[in-house]
Curated annotation (Swiss-Prot):
Gene3D superfamilies cross-referenced by the UniProt entry: Glucose-6-phosphate isomerase like protein, domain 1 (3.40.50.10490), Helix hairpin bin (1.10.287.610)
Keywords: Ribonucleoprotein, Ribosomal protein
CDD domains xrefs: RPS2
GO CC aspect terms: cytosolic small ribosomal subunit
Domain of life of the native organism: Bacteria
Family: Belongs to the universal ribosomal protein uS2 family.
Protein name per UniProt: Small ribosomal subunit protein uS2
Gene Ontology terms for molecular function: structural constituent of ribosome
Gene Ontology process terms (BP): translation
Amino acid sequence: MPVVSMKELLEAGVHFGHSKSRWNPKMAPYIYGVRHGIHIIDLNKTIVMLEDAYHFVSDVIAQGGEILFVGTKKQAKDIIKEEAERCGAFYVNERWVGGLLTNFQTVRKSIMKLQTLERMEEDGIFDVLPKKEVRNLRRKMEKLRKLYNGIRDMKKLPDVIWIVDTVREKIAVSEARKLGIPIVAIADSNCDPTVIDYTIPGNDDAIKSIKLLTSKIADAVLEGKQRRESAEEVVPTKERRPVEITERERQLFEQAVEMSEKYAELDKDSTEYE
């Protein structure tokens, strides 16, 4: 049974891309067509490619790997935190600090500095320091928490990275590629899928779409951990039988596209999606 159903994808609006004028031609293989000036993403391909991504993530985790969730735009940040915490993954949902991966040891020093400040507060050292100095230390501590709280226990580089909006998170993409860390990501119609190792064609702006796809990756992490604990033999993703799209699901998708008149006024480039 597929990881996700056509009905789930349609209800979450995963098929809505950006306006035609904003597309990246490299996404052409994943575009079904255009409706009212908006690219429609081919969900038949989304189902198959999400399946591959899901099993890849599960395999990595089952073999003892770790994953980092990344998404800093406002409609993604809360979802990234919630789903990462649900599956026990590391996450970045505020601002990507340049060098977070490529200069990881320096980042670790900043995290150690945060831990030192927290110990000072717990041990009552702040109580005997001048108020002005304490204010400055607390301000510094909060800034470090905001930046690094989701990775404070990450002792080494992640083995895979999940990204929502590779255009916005281009620095994270660049660093991961430089280090050879596999990228699993949503590819909206304005993205370059060639920088992604496991592409999931879909809407990376709508909250429901982000939630659905991120939750599936979190589910893959949980499954991988369960397999690791049960010492299940890992079957490489490439050896799995590919998922097949049923005729019923194909028809459901085509009907939904044809009925998209009611979305004629939808403008993904409006402030609703900023």
